[in-house]
Amino acid sequence: MPLTNVIYCGVCDFPAEYCEFSGKFKRCKAWLQENHPELYTKWYGDVTEDVSKQLAESSIGDEREEKLEKALEKLERKQQAREERELAKKLSSKVVIRREARTKRKCMIAISGLEVFEIDMKKLSKTFASKFATGCSISKNAEKKEEVIVQGDLADEVEAYIHSLLEEKGMKEVKVEVIDAAKKKKKAETTTTPGSENKK
C-alpha cells in the first residue's frame, strides 16, 4: 500500500485539505495557489484567474485577519485577567461557620461567606435540610449578606461538607473558620455571675 504524501499548509500548519477550518482560509488559499497550483486547481478551480486580483484580495484578507486575531488576543487577555482577579478574590476569602446558642440546650449553625464562591444558597439549604434531617433557612446577617442557618449542633458535619464542596470547585486552599459563639457567650455569663467579685 503506497504511503500518502500529506501536504501541510505553510500558513496554518493544518493538512492543506483542512485549511477551511483554520480561520485563515484566504491566506491559506493564496499560499496553496503559489506553492501547489495543481492542488489549487483541483480543489478551487482554474489557476489562470487574475493573480493580481487574488493577491489584492489576499492582502485585504490578511489585514482583516490580523485585526481579528489582535482583537481576539486582547479579549482573551482581558478574560484571563478577569479570571485571575476572581480566583485571587476567592482564594483570599473565607467561609465562616458560627455556632450560636438559641436556648440553654439548643444551638444553631450560621454559615456565611459562600456568595463569593458562586454557591447556590437555596440549593445548599435544601441539601442540609435533607442530609441532616433538620430545619434550614436563609437569612441576612448584620453585614446584609446572606447566610445559611442550620438548626442543631452540627458544626463538625457542616464544616466537613463545606470542605468537600469547596474541594469539588477546586478551592481546597480556601480557609474555613469555625467560631463557637455559644461557648464565648457561656464563658462571659460565668465570669459576670453576681457575687463573683466578692469572692476575690
UniProtKB/Swiss-Prot annotation:
InterPro entries: DENR/SUI1_TIF, DENR_C, DENR_eukaryotes, DENR_N, SUI1, SUI1_dom_sf
Subcellular localization: Cytoplasm
Keywords annotated in UniProt: Cytoplasm, Ribonucleoprotein, Ribosomal protein
GO cellular component: cytoplasm; ribonucleoprotein complex; ribosome
SUI1 domain sequence ranges: 95-166
Record flagged with keyword Phosphoprotein: no
GO BP field: formation of translation preinitiation complex; translation reinitiation
Matching Pfam families: DENR_N, SUI1
Single GO term (MF): translation initiation factor activity
Subunit structure as annotated in this protein's UniProt entry: Interacts with the 40S ribosomal subunit.
Domain text: The SUI1 domain may be involved in RNA binding.
Similarity comment: Belongs to the DENR family.
The name this protein goes by in its record: Translation machinery-associated protein 22
